[in-house]
Amino acid sequence: MLNTGRCGSTTFIKACQHISNYTSSHESLLNKTGQQRLNYPDNHIEADNRLSWFLGQLDKKYSDDAVYVHLKRERQAVAESFSKRIDFGILKAYEQGILLHAEHRLCAFDIAVDYIDTINANIELFLKDKTHKIDVSVETVTTDFPRFWKMIGAQGDLDEAIKEWSINYNAS
């Protein structure tokens, strides 16, 4: 599952844990590199916002043979959440490692918006020729998640999965 982060990926995996014919994890291969970084088992759902930096490798390994989910949340809400995390994590890495700002040159919100727009554009470009893809939006999750459930032929307790979306996991 591809995403920017701060958009419900932890909740998505909590919901997927009510699927009995798939395994699911959140950022399970963070300590791996190379081919091992994307070595997920069959019938597995993985949420990791860092996958957006491995799209070329992801395409080589899975091509159009996987179901790709683009998890989204309203841009303003994601940017506000990321703004509170400017001094650590992926936003700090983006500001200092990609933009090469040794110190805060822009406000945290503007850096977050740039990061979000960049990551979403990269994901959209990656997905443009994929046939097994679905967008899931936090704002419309009660209709989007059941479509995802049906698309993958999930078995389990959909009602309990939907209930997970009423809980704020990993909030900031």
Where do the protein language model's features map onto the residues?
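Short, well-ordered beta-to-alpha junction loops that form the rim of enzyme active sites
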Residues: 4, 138-141
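C-terminal accessory extensions appended to soluble enzyme cores
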Residues: 153-172
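Short catalytic-loop micro-motif centered on adjacent basic/acidic residues
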Residues: 44-46, 134-137
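PAPS-dependent sulfotransferase catalytic domain
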Residues: 55-125, 130-135, 142-157
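PAPS-dependent sulfotransferase catalytic core
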Residues: 1-50, 171-172
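Short, solvent-exposed coil/turn segments
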Residues: 38-40, 109, 131, 169
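Short, acidic/turn-prone active-site loops that include or flank metal/cofactor-
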Residues: 27-32, 74, 161-163
